[in-house]
Amino acid sequence: MNNSDFDNVQLFRRIIDQGFCQGDLSIADEICAAKLSEHEYLAKTDAPGPEILKDQIRDARSSIRDLVLTVEDIVESGDTVWARSRATGSDPRSGKPVSIYVIDICRFDNGKLVEHWGVPDRFALLHQIGALPPKPPLGH
């Protein structure tokens, strides 16, 4: 099989839907390569590929209660999928609703995720849960 035999957009959507939204960690064993190059800031990178993705799923689901990720834009170019998604739910400590954007770039090889860059808007998350001071009024 070669890369043209796989629907990389569908593989990405399965990671989002089954993994992040439903909490099904087995998706990582199915779709991740044993060696995953992870470039997301603060991500654990010293584990086998599936364990890296499982850690990210657990972290996201513990950081945002009732997590729903909605893919709003998605583009495929060759072996790479680029997506902008909205993550919604609530802060588990305060119960405050949260809504942030996440940018993902995933490279696949023969149906396996081999490289990932992730940019969740952590600044927006911290602001929404009150961990950062409120924005000052205009003109000050």
Predicted regions and their residues:
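Short, low-complexity N-terminal intrinsically disordered segments enriched in polar/charged residues
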Residues: 1-34, 134-140
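A solvent-exposed, acidic/Ser-Thr-rich amphipathic alpha-helical stretch
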Residues: 25-81
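Short, surface-exposed coil-to-beta transition loops
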Residues: 68-69, 98-103
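Conserved hydrophobic/aromatic beta-strand scaffold that supports enzyme active sites
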Residues: 82-84, 103-105
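Generic short beta-strand segments
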Residues: 84-90
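Short, acidic, Ser/Thr-enriched surface-loop or helix-capping motifs
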Residues: 92, 108
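Low-complexity, intrinsically disordered terminal/linker segments enriched in charged
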Residues: 115-140
